């Protein structure tokens, strides 16, 4: 039975039992920044189990795409070397939300395994929690499993309820016992039943886990029965397929065998049992589906995990002798295997292929050099009888060649060696310290402050009259008084100043009273809810306890707000135009512009930029109000508010509805979209592989930009004697004229070269049967020099020639040697002889080579030495 049929039978079976088939959710957990990847079937139902979400069904079944390759759930190191470890896997599951419980869950599982899949009953063993007599009795008395094949597992992990057969969602919350079903591969395979000393063997393999959410555990560890008891089950498709296809390794099932054969094809590998092929076959699944769900290779978070997986696959291809891009070619094979079950993979095939190809090409630029250095270092360690690679070298590979530490460690592990990671960490720490010392930054997080939080009034006010100074800092130290001319950090009890956060810059402004004036140049957080005003005391003396009027630069704030609000609209517009894979990777919002980095694997076309601008400006013209609500985080994300991975959110969050955009945001914004005025994208480019950057301006800045652009268009039109509306046509005409003139010029240069060639041939000097010529050809370009050398070679028959030209303080050199003469004189060596004397270098074939230089004053002497240099070689 093939994997696709196994998946289909599972879903159809539970559908026949009243379950709703629910499509697999994304590998990027929806609106849950705390979880790296979806790693089980229950993730998309977490809120249902917690009682914060309701679905129109109480029974569900899924085939859930899952990844375990980052953080707590990380199987990456073992993938390819064991029978059942994968980065990507499919979890088959059935769920009951306050509907059926243990009896039906166990009965359904037994019926599916023994009747639908027709597994022999005497091959199935089960485990139950030590105290779960109910589950034990169901298996023994209702299902009829013999007592010797039912094993009770107690608290085997060192604490109360810490057991392989007791499941918890966390330290508190829903929990309960579970029962696991194992398949016995028979006495020919080593291993013992679960709970025995030999349980880690391969004879008894867990295939299904049935979790019974029976209790709620409070902070004191007390257990109370849940009013609605639920069921969450999970069975790995790959493990089940191995059992049904009578193989002992998941990599032997049909799905993997087809991918392994494809990997062998693209790497030109004959040995299908090579572990590297298993690694590649596994990794193409994880990488492709992560990209389908919007993850792009990068240097942090999910993107970094994806990059690690891609690079590990590439390195295994490299081990197999593949020195060029190959990994992306497997996407089509994966689509053939899994595209029917997951149409989203088929739809994204080209995008996935492009992202992987770009990442491969980028990594192959560095891997060969880095691998040669690493292999040489490992060979040196082995020659000395060592087992540890120097951490400093590992850091050099990381810092200079882009080798992640885990990649170096992976190579070492395969050689039976380890990396000195403490030394690596020391080198990394030194570099960070040097970067801090070299950089100019305001240290706020290091300030020692133990007072009350700052009350922020900046959402409603631009000034606050009775702000009290509660702390002062000069050069990082707490002081009681600041004098005129000193730079300082001022902490107030109340302030309208916004502290830099979420990509928005801090406010500027003034703190003042009748005798004192403090100019605020920036506002940063001292602690999470404590705001520091950085600046210079321009007048008077400032003491702790003084009362000031705190007033921000209102015009600067207004411009910043326009740009921040436009960023929200642009983010939404980019997702509409480019696709849901667009995710924010960074932003900077100040008074001049908004800079927005996002995941996308190709430059934006002019049409895409225009569409984004049009969508945003349409929202501006709609003049929709900005509506801010403070609500619980779970309620916000359930309502569709976009949360950003990596951002930290409290229990209460601020939700901004602005036009068609809804995001969690603590920044300051316009009252209505119309306040933005005008939106214009001015820069689009790449900042890293798979990361694009857009810069845009708004309001009066955008108006000035358009006016200046209009003025330049008018100037260009006047220079070309055309109307602005005719500019494109006129430019095309000028380009045609230039092309025609360049063609004429080329013909004249060629004619000149021909005539000069005849004259130069007469200057050739015969040395040992070879005509030697070294001369300058005034006004010639590289093409003319080459053509002239070719004609001289033809004319002189046996010759060694160097021609030079000087233009703009730079020397161009072409050397040519006829076939007979090249046996003793090489053009590359000849041109380098001259180039080294004029501050340059070059190279080429034995019969033709070129070079350049930056010291034309030395050219006459260099050419004069050619005859003697050739004489020495004939």
From Swiss-Prot:
<dbReference type="Pfam" id="PF01411">
    <property type="entry name" value="tRNA-synt_2c"/>
</dbReference>
<feature type="binding site">
    <location>
        <position position="665"/>
    </location>
    <ligand>
        <name>Zn(2+)</name>
    </ligand>
</feature>
<keyword id="KW-0436">Ligase</keyword>
<dbReference type="InterPro" id="IPR009000">
    <property type="entry name" value="Transl_B-barrel_sf"/>
</dbReference>
<keyword id="KW-0862">Zinc</keyword>
<dbReference type="GO" id="GO:0008270">
    <property type="term" value="F:zinc ion binding"/>
</dbReference>
<feature type="binding site">
    <location>
        <position position="568"/>
    </location>
    <ligand>
        <name>Zn(2+)</name>
    </ligand>
</feature>
<keyword id="KW-0479">Metal-binding</keyword>
<keyword id="KW-0694">RNA-binding</keyword>
<protein>
    <recommendedName>
        <fullName>Alanine--tRNA ligase</fullName>
        <ecNumber>6.1.1.7</ecNumber>
    </recommendedName>
</protein>
<keyword id="KW-0820">tRNA-binding</keyword>
<dbReference type="InterPro" id="IPR002318">
    <property type="entry name" value="Ala-tRNA-lgiase_IIc"/>
</dbReference>
<dbReference type="InterPro" id="IPR012947">
    <property type="entry name" value="tRNA_SAD"/>
</dbReference>
<keyword id="KW-0963">Cytoplasm</keyword>
<dbReference type="GO" id="GO:0004813">
    <property type="term" value="F:alanine-tRNA ligase activity"/>
</dbReference>
<dbReference type="GO" id="GO:0000049">
    <property type="term" value="F:tRNA binding"/>
</dbReference>
<dbReference type="GO" id="GO:0045892">
    <property type="term" value="P:negative regulation of DNA-templated transcription"/>
</dbReference>
<dbReference type="InterPro" id="IPR018162">
    <property type="entry name" value="Ala-tRNA-ligase_IIc_anticod-bd"/>
</dbReference>
<dbReference type="Pfam" id="PF07973">
    <property type="entry name" value="tRNA_SAD"/>
</dbReference>
<keyword id="KW-0067">ATP-binding</keyword>
<feature type="binding site">
    <location>
        <position position="564"/>
    </location>
    <ligand>
        <name>Zn(2+)</name>
    </ligand>
</feature>
<feature type="binding site">
    <location>
        <position position="669"/>
    </location>
    <ligand>
        <name>Zn(2+)</name>
    </ligand>
</feature>
<comment type="function">
    <text>Catalyzes the attachment of alanine to tRNA(Ala) in a two-step reaction: alanine is first activated by ATP to form Ala-AMP and then transferred to the acceptor end of tRNA(Ala). Also edits incorrectly charged Ser-tRNA(Ala) and Gly-tRNA(Ala) via its editing domain.</text>
</comment>
<dbReference type="GO" id="GO:0005524">
    <property type="term" value="F:ATP binding"/>
</dbReference>
<dbReference type="GO" id="GO:0006419">
    <property type="term" value="P:alanyl-tRNA aminoacylation"/>
</dbReference>
<dbReference type="InterPro" id="IPR018164">
    <property type="entry name" value="Ala-tRNA-synth_IIc_N"/>
</dbReference>
<dbReference type="InterPro" id="IPR045864">
    <property type="entry name" value="aa-tRNA-synth_II/BPL/LPL"/>
</dbReference>
<comment type="similarity">
    <text>Belongs to the class-II aminoacyl-tRNA synthetase family.</text>
</comment>
<keyword id="KW-0547">Nucleotide-binding</keyword>
<dbReference type="Pfam" id="PF02272">
    <property type="entry name" value="DHHA1"/>
</dbReference>
<dbReference type="InterPro" id="IPR050058">
    <property type="entry name" value="Ala-tRNA_ligase"/>
</dbReference>
<keyword id="KW-0030">Aminoacyl-tRNA synthetase</keyword>
<dbReference type="GO" id="GO:0005829">
    <property type="term" value="C:cytosol"/>
</dbReference>
<keyword id="KW-0648">Protein biosynthesis</keyword>
<dbReference type="GO" id="GO:0002161">
    <property type="term" value="F:aminoacyl-tRNA deacylase activity"/>
</dbReference>
<dbReference type="InterPro" id="IPR023033">
    <property type="entry name" value="Ala_tRNA_ligase_euk/bac"/>
</dbReference>
<dbReference type="InterPro" id="IPR003156">
    <property type="entry name" value="DHHA1_dom"/>
</dbReference>
<dbReference type="InterPro" id="IPR018163">
    <property type="entry name" value="Thr/Ala-tRNA-synth_IIc_edit"/>
</dbReference>
<dbReference type="InterPro" id="IPR018165">
    <property type="entry name" value="Ala-tRNA-synth_IIc_core"/>
</dbReference>
């Amino acid at each position: 039975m093939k994997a696709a049929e196994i998946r289909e039978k599972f879903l159809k079976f539970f559908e026949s039992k009243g379950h709703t088939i629910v499509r697999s959710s994304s590998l990027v957990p929806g609106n849950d920044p705390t979880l790296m990847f979806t790693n089980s079937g229950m993730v998309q139902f977490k809120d249902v189990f917690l009682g914060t979400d309701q679905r129109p069904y109480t029974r569900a079944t899924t085939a859930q795409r899952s990844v375990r390759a980052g953080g707590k759930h990380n199987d990456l190191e073992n993938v390819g070397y064991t029978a059942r470890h994968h980065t990507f896997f499919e979890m088959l599951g059935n769920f009951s939300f306050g509907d059926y419980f243990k009896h039906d869950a166990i009965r359904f599982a037994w019926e599916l395994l023994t009747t639908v899949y027709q597994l022999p009953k005497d091959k199935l063993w089960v485990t139950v929690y030590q105290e779960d007599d109910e589950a034990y009795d169901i298996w023994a008395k209702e299902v009829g499993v013999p007592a010797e094949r039912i094993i009770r597992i107690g608290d085997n992990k060192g604490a109360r309820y810490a057991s392989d057969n007791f499941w918890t969602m966390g330290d508190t919350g829903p929990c309960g016992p579970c029962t696991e079903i194992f398949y016995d591969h028979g006495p020919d395979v080593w291993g013992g039943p679960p709970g025995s000393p030999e349980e880690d063997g391969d004879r008894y393999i867990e295939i299904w886990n049935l979790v019974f959410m029976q209790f709620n555990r409070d902070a004191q560890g007390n257990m109370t029965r849940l009013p609605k008891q639920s069921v969450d089950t999970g069975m790995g498709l790959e493990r089940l397929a191995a059992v049904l296809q009578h193989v002992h390794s998941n990599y032997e099932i049909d799905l993997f065998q087809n991918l392994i054969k494809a990997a062998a094809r693209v790497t030109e590998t004959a040995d299908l049992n090579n572990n590297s092929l298993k690694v590649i076959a596994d990794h193409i699944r994880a990488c492709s589906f992560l990209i389908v769900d919007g993850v792009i290779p990068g240097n942090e978070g999910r993107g970094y995990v994806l990059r690690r997986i891609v690079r590990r696959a590439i390195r295994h291809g490299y081990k197999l002798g593949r020195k060029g891009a190959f990994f992306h070619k497997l996407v089509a094979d994966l689509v053939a295997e899994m595209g029917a079950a997951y149409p989203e993979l088929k739809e994204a095939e080209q995008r996935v292929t492009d992202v992987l190809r770009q990442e491969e090409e980028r990594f192959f630029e560095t891997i060969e050099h880095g691998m040669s250095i690493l292999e040489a270092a490992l060979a040196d360690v082995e020659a000395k009888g060592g087992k540890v690679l120097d951490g400093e070298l590992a850091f050099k590979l990381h810092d200079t060649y882009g080798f992640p530490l885990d990649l170096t460690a992976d190579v070492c592990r395969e050689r039976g060696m380890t990396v000195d990671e403490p030394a690596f960490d020391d080198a990394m720490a030194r570099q960070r310290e040097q970067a801090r010392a070299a950089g100019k930054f305001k240290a706020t997080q290091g300030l020692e402050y133990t007072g009350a939080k700052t009350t922020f009034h900046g959402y409603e006010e631009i000034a606050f009259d009775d702000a009290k100074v509660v702390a002062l800092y000069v050069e990082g130290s707490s002081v009681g008084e600041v004098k005129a001319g000193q730079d300082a950090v001022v902490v107030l009890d109340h302030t309208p100043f916004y502290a830099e956060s979420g990509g928005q810059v801090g406010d500027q402004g003034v703190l003042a009273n009748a005798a004192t004036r403090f100019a605020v140049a920036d506002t940063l957080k001292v602690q999470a809810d404590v705001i520091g005003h950085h600046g210079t005391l321009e007048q008077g003396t400032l003491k702790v306890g003084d009362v000031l009027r705190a007033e921000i630069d209102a015009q600067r704030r207004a411009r910043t707000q326009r740009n921040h609000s436009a960023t929200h609209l642009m983010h939404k517009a980019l997702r509409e135009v480019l696709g849901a894979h667009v995710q924010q990777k960074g932003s900077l919002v100040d008074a001049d512009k908004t800079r927005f980095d996002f995941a996308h694997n190709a430059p934006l076309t002019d049409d895409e930029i225009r569409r984004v601008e049009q969508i945003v400006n349409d929202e501006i013209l709609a003049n929709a109000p900005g509506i801010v609500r403070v609500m619980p985080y779970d309620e916000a994300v359930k309502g569709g508010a976009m949360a950003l991975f990596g951002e930290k959110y409290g229990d209460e969050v601020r939700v901004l509805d602005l036009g068609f955009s809804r995001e969690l945001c603590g920044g300051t914004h316009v009252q209505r979209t119309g306040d933005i005025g005008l939106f214009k994208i001015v820069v689009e480019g790449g900042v890293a592989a798979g990361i694009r950057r857009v810069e845009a301006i708004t309001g009066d800045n955008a108006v000035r930009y358009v006016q200046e652009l209009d003025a330049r268009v008018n100037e260009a039109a006047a220079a070309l004697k055309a109307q602005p509306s005719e500019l494109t046509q006129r430019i095309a005409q000028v380009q045609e004229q230039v092309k025609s003139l360049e063609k004429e010029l080329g013909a004249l240069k060629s004619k000149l070269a021909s005539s000069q060639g005849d004259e130069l041939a007469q200057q050739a000097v015969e040395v040992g049967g070879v005509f030697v010529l070294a001369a300058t050809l005034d006004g010639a370009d590289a093409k003319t020099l080459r053509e002239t050398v070719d004609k001289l070679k033809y004319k002189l028959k046996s010759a060694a020639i160097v021609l030079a030209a000087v233009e703009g303080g730079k020397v161009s050199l072409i050397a040519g040697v006829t076939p007979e003469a090249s046996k003793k004189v090489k053009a590359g060596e000849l041109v380098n002889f001259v180039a080294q004397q004029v501050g340059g270098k070059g190279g080429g074939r034995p019969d033709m080579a070129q070079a350049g230089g930056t010291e034309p004053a030395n050219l006459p002497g260099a050419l004069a030495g050619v005859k003697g240099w050739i004489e020495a070689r004939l």
